[in-house]
Amino acid sequence: MEKSKELFARACKTIPGGVNSPVRACGSVGTDPCFIARGQGSAIFDADGKQYIDYIGSWGPLILGHRHPAVIKAIEAALANGCTFGAPTELEIDLAEAVVNIMPSVEMVRMVNSGTEATMSAIRLARGATGRDGIVKFDGCYHGHGDSLLVAAGSGVATLGIPGSPGVPDKVAESTASLEYNNIEAVKEYCKKKGDRTAAIIVEPVAGNMGVVAPKPEFIQGLREVCDQYGIVLILDEVMTGFRVALGGAQSLYGVTPDLTTMGKVIGGGLPVGAYGGKRSLMEKIAPSGPVYQAGTLSGNPMAMAAGIATLKEISAPGFYEALEKSSQTLADGLKKAAADAGVEAVISRVGSMQTLFFSAGPVENFEDAKKCDLDRFSKFYQGMRAEGVFLPPSQFEAWFVSSAHTEADIEATLKAAEKVLRQL
């Protein structure tokens, strides 16, 4: 860690907090960050040359692992023709067609550069289409760092233990209501009073930014019914879950049809990307075909499109998700047993290849449950696992990601490390 410590000290002189995204600083787990030099398959290597089994996967995009040959080949082929043109390319159509063919509810799609851009644009579209201002989100759900969505948010906001962010005007925050996740009755009560003023309900169909929290069936289905009743646009934020928990995202897993879907991470194959899509009647309201404006200098850039196309081709192969499910289940079952054998109160929450080990005595169904977890114990667990060569998200409120590159040996080594560390807690 000597080189990483040197790099962190150097970074702090020119980069706020020494990192370009807060959770990476590892402050909540009482240690300094690892600076990474390279990755290969399921492994990453820090600046000192130490190898780790990686369960961050760049926070979700790397479902195929690091430097997958098909993705690298596609990026190199695109790069040979130029980085970006500021004009349409065929690759944009190819990726859009792939997304529309895979994602059940998406009839048209617009490419952007990040998940934050996708959610901000989807909110604007919902407001423009309905003529309403109100937004409903859920405590602990994170939808990027747009002003109107930084209310009772998860991810780094939860990790830092802050309710929102200075710099968000009260008038902006007032237009957003944050309700309890998995509580459909709270949504119904709210909409009785303000449903006719609400433009959109946005939700992570599987919460992944307060740790992994699965939706109750009556909650996710109930949102669709409430939105239909009041003419509200239902937005599923599938930036994390899209192409991750199932090929067709969480919407295919739970059988719910949103009006709009936001996407990112996996569809960029590790390059910066985002997208939002949905019903043709809504999407045609976006400029230049409609009055709702949205634009981006690097939107649809060739390298990200090429990486996304290659990734979607790989994950569409027969048996891909079955194999990923098997690895993820083996890891979850092993962690559950290791915690029980060590006498440590813990809950494993998993949907597909996303999972979290909560240091909690009972089930975690919402943000209040997540906040009751033993954060000190998680910090010790994180530090111990990192020392054993296992790279986990440095926050109790983040998801672990299993990739197709994780082997049986990787899972076995991870569980062996977990058994050792859990016994020491």
Curated annotation (Swiss-Prot):
The modification N6-(pyridoxal phosphate)lysine is found at K265. It catalyses: (S)-4-amino-5-oxopentanoate = 5-aminolevulinate. Its EC number is 5.4.3.8. It is found in: Cytoplasm. One of its GO terms (molecular function) is transaminase activity. It is an enzyme of class 5 (isomerase). PANTHER family: GLUTAMATE-1-SEMIALDEHYDE 2,1-AMINOMUTASE (PTHR43713), GLUTAMATE-1-SEMIALDEHYDE 2,1-AMINOMUTASE 1, CHLOROPLASTIC-RELATED (PTHR43713:SF3). This is Glutamate-1-semialdehyde 2,1-aminomutase.
